[in-house]
Amino acid sequence: MPFYRRTVVPQRLCPRNPPQPLAELRDVSHLAALSLLRQLADLCGHSLALLEDLEGHLLALGRRTDSLYRRTVRLRRRLPCRLLGPEDDEELLAAANSGRENATATAHSRSSWRQPVNVFLSSGRPPSVEELLREAQLNLQSLLQEEYEEQYSEARLLGQTFRSSDGAPEPTPSPRPQSAKRLEFVLMPAKRQLSEDETTTQGVRAPEACLSLSTANKQSAWNDPFPLPILKERLWLQPCSTQSDLVPINISGQQFDRHASFRHSLFNTETAVNPKSTLRRRRTIIGFSNFSQRDQGHSSSPTGSLARSATSDIRPGHSAPQVVQGRVAVGQEARFPSLTSPGLRHSSSEPGDAHQARSASDHPGMESMAVVYSVPSSCNGPTESTFSTSWKGDAFTYMTPSASSQGNQVSENGKNPSSGNSWVPLNTLPPLVPKEAATLFVTRDNPAGCTGLPSYSEHPTLRRQIPERPPKIGLLARGTSRLETGPGGTNRFRERSLSVPTDSGVTSVDYDEEQKTSETRILPYASTSSEGSNSTDNIAALSTEQEARHRRQRSKSISLKKAKKKPSPPMRSVSLVKDEPALPPEGELVLPKDQRPRSLCLSLEHQGHHPPHPDAQGHPAVPMLKDPGSTQFSHHWYLTDWKSGDTYQSLSSSSTATGTTVIECTQVQGSSESLASPSTSRATTPSQLSIEVEAREVASPGRPTGLMSPSSGYSSQSETPTPTVSMSLTLGHLPPPSASVRVRPVVPERKSSLPPTSPMEKICKSRLSFDLPLTSSTTLDLSGMSISIRSKTKVSRHHSDTNFGVKLAQKTSPNQPIMPMVTQSDLRSVRLRSVSKSEPEDDIESPDYIEEPGAEEVFTMPERKVKPPIAEKPPLARRPPSLVHRPPSLPGEYPLTSPTMAMASRSSIPHMKQLPQDSYTVLRKPKSPSFPGESTASSSLVLSPLASSSGAFFSGTQQPPQASVEDGGPKVRALPERIGLQSQEEAEKKMTKIPPPVPKKPSVLYLPLTSPVAQMDACMAEPRLPFSPIITLEEDGKCPSTGDDQKSPGKGVTSPLHTDTEKEAISPGRSVEPSAEEKSLISDKTAEWIAEEEDDVFVASRTTEDLFTVIHRSKRKLLGWKETGEGFTGSKPSSHSPVKNTADSPTGEAAAAPGPSSSACLDAGRNDDFKALLQKKGSKATPRTRPSAAELLKTTNPLARRIIAQFSKDYEPTDNPST
């Protein structure tokens, strides 16, 4: 359209004098009037231009019409027979003549309107006009029907499925015969309606429509694809509920033909004829969505023919029951291709990501998925629902996506609807159906009674067919509330309500079948869920590889169903997803809550290595979970539960009431919820990722090993089985070889449940992901440390993920991944806490442990710099594992003791200070012997050239610290190769968890003096080496405590280096004396802790007794009963001989280092702390401890609170003296 070009210049219109201020109202009015006039002038110009344009068009049209008319006249003359009557002909001829004569006459004079033929008469109607009329009629009918349907749906939720828009139902004699030919149900594709000549198919000409519907000719038209008409029809009908393609039986008895064509759905012609019989009998309606068919890319005609054939099969019984059976047969056997229409999968109503993820592979199956809705009253769904209003929402009691989301998991009894299904709005479901073109089997009447419903029993067969995805008719034979979808359907539902899966109380119906069909979906979903945010990427990544795994896992998953599990809010599915990327969304959904294993499923990744874990679970479910298929879903769903909400809250809601256990499980499943989804973004640490992948393949199949013990109860030590699992999985996860045996390190799991541990674990995980490569992680696998980190991370994920995880992750995350490597960040993050408080008790129990603390100290040292205050608590829980482990590792541990002795010699910290490297070397050598014992994993980790054994163990990171730090550092590091890495990680975690006031600082301080250069060298060996100095510092801290006595002076002396190294670790105030005593404690604790983790890794069995022992020991330590004993017992005293021994006896040394108050404070603080913890005084005992993580844990978890308080006080006293 030509745009008017304004040529008038405003200044010319209203020439202005020099602008003057508008002083008067009239001036303003004048200006306004002028502007208005200008605008009007513009408008007039535009209108004039438009008019001119129109005039030109009209003239051109007139000329064209004239020429066309003349041509038509000439043509007629040439035709042998006149199309028009004589009069018309004469008129036309005359007009043509006149046109020729007046060729220049205006177009209007000769406009085509003068044509004698009446276009609207049937006789003279051209095909184009015919089509237009038909379309108009269809639109009108669709509008009318929509109105009627709404009325019916609102007024008649009852049985009237059809809301007939027009006149009374007409007996359609012809349709009946045709229905006899075809099935009773006539599927009217949209294309057919459009294609049908009778525009009245929609019901404008009801009789004709009926005839056309039933007529064979019409059928042929129907079969023929009419792409354009179909599209048009879609457009017209979409507004209508008919679009849902579920054709409710016309109960009202109104013309079914019109309805059928309108709805493009199968309907019983007989029903239309005999509304009563159909209303009574036929409750099941099979609707095929034409749109779905189109979406599928199946030509409408094939779908139509398929539907027709199916219908014909069904046709045998006019009575509703027979019809139902026939339909069932159709759905199961035929599974109309249209049901598998892509449209269903494409339906965005479902979680789009899940669908997309498996659209390619699952596409047929999903589309096939037939949603079986049991409609109690009527097939009418809510108007808003995708189902046409005909399925008024109230009518559907069917389990919606939430139940479906599990797929077959939907409970037959409708439990799902209440728990999981209720989550999915009915509206969500309807979109599913139309898009899926799923045959919507609504068993409305007495689905259970209907023989068609037996199809449910048949359904498994269908499910088995599901691999063929096309027959996706998930007929829910149970019908009433049971919504069962074909595998694809289940998956789709699963997709639809990812959060629901945990909730569904459905018993797995044909779980194996469903799993087979859903495996692929499970993988994508799991991946999505594992992501925490449903990420299509994860799904895509995992789908291929994990699909097979998920298939077998899924089948196992069935046995895992945990009916009693309390469904957590949907959010947990997201969290869970993080852990097991492959399983979470789909897998979770796959297992309804009912189906979930009673015991939480730990990832079989872990479980694979720890077969005994089932005992930890106390559930045969664990073995089942071992099945690759079952585990993923089950643990994912439970993970979702746990992770979705507060750790403890999730625990309460989760099947295992055990808060600790639940937390453990969650973390075990994915140490850092990323374990399960290594490929997904969830995997935070490369090592975890690789291990997780492996675990996913191996262990994931079963429910996570110790994840959730059905016996819940943070307090209940029986929970230890879960801890065992988490430790085994966590620790064993990384070291598959050694961890494989340790199925159930009970205590570690327990510890991981403790908030302190979890923060550290978290940190470890984060570090692994950030700083360390996957390879390092593999190295870690060899050592128990990696495992410890993982379990801790898992634990921390729930308990202190936010609080400790962030801080620790920042501090320790680089360290943790490569336990051997100690980076400066590690050193900073590592906080030497008086682990010995808690751990010395363990040590007291066995000299090994005490010695181990030396090793642990080394490990802790790298981590001591981490400030998370809560780190120590988990060590307590883990200590029993370390005890268990220690005896086996005594040779290694004793070398540690030797190193501890070396550390004791180190107690001549003065020389150590003077010759830090020399001392370090000496200590390193002692560790070297001990290291060989424990150096198996360590050697694989050999990174730094410093200590041959110890260095190897610590892969240079520890070694450099050992060399650079005091011998104690290498000793400790070298000592616990398993424990080394593991305990280092744990120490780091502890350090992070433990409040800043930790004796570790002195060691760090001392370390810097000794090994700034060595440290640098070590750092050269590995990124972690900077931390290794801190690790060494731990030992050093013991040494400095002793030799340095630097309590504060040591701090002061070491302060420069300490500030450099320990700055990272924490403030110099952490300081020598706390470093010595607390370090010994922490070292002990860490060593024990690590040993425990190692033990978990190596020694599968941890019992509640161990856990209790650890707890009691920690209590004793807190009370100070065994503080000295622990210190005496060895590794601490040996390692920190002056400080530790004096401060274990040590207290003296601790006092010496930080002043008598250090040791005394530790003992007294421990007693006070323990008492306070018992009285909840100690929960905030350590202000220096990070309240955010530790205190949160305290508040959240009584046990964690106690442990945190213990550690806090332990460190606080030391801290205060040091400070």
Swiss-Prot record:
Residues 352-364, 1076-1087 have a biased composition (Basic and acidic residues). Transmembrane segments: none annotated. Keywords: Phosphoprotein. Residues 549-567 have a biased composition (Basic residues). It comes from the Eukaryota. Residues 674-687, 1145-1160 have a biased composition (Low complexity). It holds the Pfam family NHS. The keyword Phosphoprotein applies. The modification Phosphoserine is found at S499, S575, S690, S1048, S1208. Residues 162-181, 288-321, 336-364, 400-423, 474-591, 669-741, 854-938, 979-1003, 1033-1087, 1121-1197 are annotated as: Disordered. InterPro entries: NHS-like (IPR024845). Residues 288-312, 526-545, 708-729, 897-908, 1131-1144 have a biased composition (Polar residues). The keyword DNA damage does not apply. Belongs to the NHS family. PANTHER family: NANCE-HORAN SYNDROME PROTEIN, NHS-LIKE PROTEIN 2. This is NHS-like protein 2. It comes from Mus musculus.
